[in-house]
Amino acid sequence: MKNLLSISDLTPNEILSIMDEADRFAEALKGREVKKLPTLRGRTVFTMFYENSTRTRASFETAGKWMSADVINISASSSSVKKGESLRDTALTLKSIGADALVMRHPSSGAAQHVANFIGDTAVINAGDGSNQHPTQALLDATTLRRQRGDLSGQHVVIVGDILHSRVARSNAQLLNALGADVTFVAPPTLLPIGVENWGVRVSHDLDAELPSADAVMMLRVQAERMNGGFFPSHREYATRYGLSKARHAMLKPDAVVMHPGPMLRGMEINYSVADAPNTVVLQQVTAGVHVRMAILFQLLIGGHSASETETDA
């Protein structure tokens, strides 16, 4: 694996390899007072974020630093991008400085692929490109779900909300299908993309009908920043029809889990108390995100050996 641009680039075995590696890193860090491994000592990772981020950016930085890499953050608002520098020139500048990996988030779909086409031997990791792909989010979601419920084959995962603008929904649908899960999208017709029937998922507009059979429910934020028109009458009506209320939460099986990629809009797509319920695994997703991103950096920059084979005390 040279880059990580899309879930569709990975085979099921490669997906499972990353998830297994993430679990090995979690085990390697368990009980350590100082969370530091020498795995990527001497490697340099640049994060290039052209959109705001909390979880993805912080967990990539943590992942790199816990493996002793030098991690340098570049934000569009404080770089030469503000002076008109192109994405190509910025990426080539960082490569010339000595980047071993570029972690990219960009509002344009295909931006990470564009950089990968000319950057040579520097690894490119897509941390979200427009409404196209968010492969590391799908990998951490699957890792979290497997830790909670075991093998994903046959699990019914219901993904609810703004599917149209969601790179998370696209990446999760591809990954979950690859691992044999059954995926249902629930959304108003205005928030479903054209051609969604070809994604290998079921589509429903009735959340109440899907909840009783769900093994996991993933709530998505309405991405108002990507909307230019009225996709639903009001926030109140959206929450009434598609929000995970306390009453709807009670419809779930006892062992079902509630997920959210964040940031959550409490009171919109998820009830305040449901967001903090015992079976809501949002914080477990964040924790898994660090382990998964460690695994990805490791496989791209080292490869060929498992974390357990390369681990020594720092």
From Swiss-Prot:
The keyword Nuclease belongs to this UniProt entry's keyword annotation: no
GO MF assignments: amino acid binding; aspartate carbamoyltransferase activity
The entry's keywords: Pyrimidine biosynthesis, Transferase
Signal peptide: none
Reaction(s) the record says it catalyses: carbamoyl phosphate + L-aspartate = N-carbamoyl-L-aspartate + phosphate + H(+)
GO cellular component: cytosol
Gene3D superfamilies the UniProt entry points to: Aspartate/ornithine carbamoyltransferase (3.40.50.1370)
Binding site for carbamoyl phosphate: 55-56, 105, 134, 137, 262-263
Pathway annotation from the record: Pyrimidine metabolism; UMP biosynthesis via de novo pathway; (S)-dihydroorotate from bicarbonate: step 2/3
Residue sites binding L-aspartate per the record: 83, 167, 221
Biological processes, Gene Ontology terms: 'de novo' pyrimidine nucleobase biosynthetic process; 'de novo' UMP biosynthetic process; amino acid metabolic process
Uppermost EC category: transferase
EC numbers: 2.1.3.2
Pfam families: OTCace, OTCace_N
Subunit structure, as described in the record: Heterododecamer (2C3:3R2) of six catalytic PyrB chains organized as two trimers (C3), and six regulatory PyrI chains organized as three dimers (R2).
Family as reported in the entry's similarity comment: Belongs to the aspartate/ornithine carbamoyltransferase superfamily. ATCase family.
NCBIfam families (alphabetical): asp_carb_tr, PRK00856.1
Entry function: Catalyzes the condensation of carbamoyl phosphate and aspartate to form carbamoyl aspartate and inorganic phosphate, the committed step in the de novo pyrimidine nucleotide biosynthesis pathway.
Protein name per Swiss-Prot or TrEMBL: Aspartate carbamoyltransferase catalytic subunit
